[in-house]
Amino acid sequence: MKKTIRITVLTALLLTLSLASAGTMAGAKTKNGFTYKITKNQVKIVSCSKNQKRIVIPNKIAGKKVTSLGANVWKKSSKVQTVVLPKYLKTIEKKQADYAWGNIVKKKNIFSTPFTGCGKLKNIKVAKGNKYFCSAKGVLYTKNKKTLLVYPAGRTQKSYTIQGKTTQIGEAAFEYAKYLQKISYGKKLFYISDGAFFASGLRSVELAKNISNVGLYAFAYSTKLQKVTLGDKVEQINTPFIGCTNLKQFQADKKEIGYYAVNDVLYYKDKKHI
């Protein structure tokens, strides 16, 4: 019987799925290009009209601590390359889109994040003293580096090595990273979240070592992806390769419990075609 993993998201207190309606802007104020709302003496940034290479989000606005970053802060930004997150930031929202099949085939991303529209973003930095997040050479992680949260889409390097402590890749973490061709990771990584590599530039993927769960549409529309290798720990994959039009080859470890490959076609062990 194929096993199913139930994962408790380690960053539930940090990454809130925003299901808010269009009424989000009600009661908002604007100062120095930042539109914000104050709730219980804490500031949430809901949008930013600044379109410049470097943007520093202030630690405080109107004397209140900036603790939250909304899912649509930059819907589209053609210039921003560096963002500095504030000292008191606790929450980075990700708005879950409609998973309906019609939206997926139209190549609509399944999450909106504060950085989704920042195609030239290369570095995310964190103000000194922040207790919840850290930056590893411009890539955003939780403070303990257990979860990789955001890999800036505008980085031009062809390969990236995930921190050795990291156990999971967050939702939409590598979305639109079109220059990225290869990803490497340590033995502790076991979970790849929904939409993690949506529309990325990856050429090949090795789901080996300790990876056991691959989220919904994790590699969707990575149109340059050609080869996928499954290791002996993979227990659950959730339609991760929709829109991968150049995917030609599947390989599965002979000892792998849940899947096997014949002539580059992936099957469940019960011989039902995936």
Set out the residue ranges of the language-model regions.
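Conserved, function-critical positions that sit in or immediately flank catalytic
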Residues: 241
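Sec-dependent signal peptide cleavage junction
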Residues: 19-32
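Conserved functional micro-motifs across diverse proteins
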Residues: 44-45
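Acidic, Ser/Thr
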Residues: 48, 72-75
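Bacterial N-terminal signal peptides
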Residues: 11-20
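Bacterial N-terminal signal peptides that target proteins for export
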Residues: 1-12
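Structural signature of tandem-repeat unit edges
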Residues: 33-41, 50-68, 78-94, 98-111, ...
